[in-house]
């Protein structure tokens, strides 16, 4: 079972037929394969990861957020990573691609646009770091710093309770450290 990456994709194209094609492929769950087709009839892990940037195709009818003649906005989950390699191919086909992504299990997020992939490793960040270092659009879209702050508070509560339970169980005197303590 993969870790799922949350994605939002905004596609624009001068040709309305390309937008319709993208919408229809997304609704079928064959979005990437429509524009970057797999060779042969068999699925190939290495080929998909190399040419799509992710293990499996994406899309379903539920994830279509909005569509106009020249724009399609969708959201979807992808296996392990965003389909950045597919985005590059879409740009070659005349699409303008703007995508955001967040993978909470592996602690990364990013924005992909015409300048490439702006990737953020969150693994050594706390909620304050995320608020300061991530673009606010990305943080707000996925609620990253808010989720991290909730986790930090829950974790602190668990550690505090664990300490209190241990002191009580062993009959020791509680030791209170100040915030300025180096101990």
Q: What is the predicted role of each segment?
A:
Residues 1-183:
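Long, contiguous binding/interaction regions
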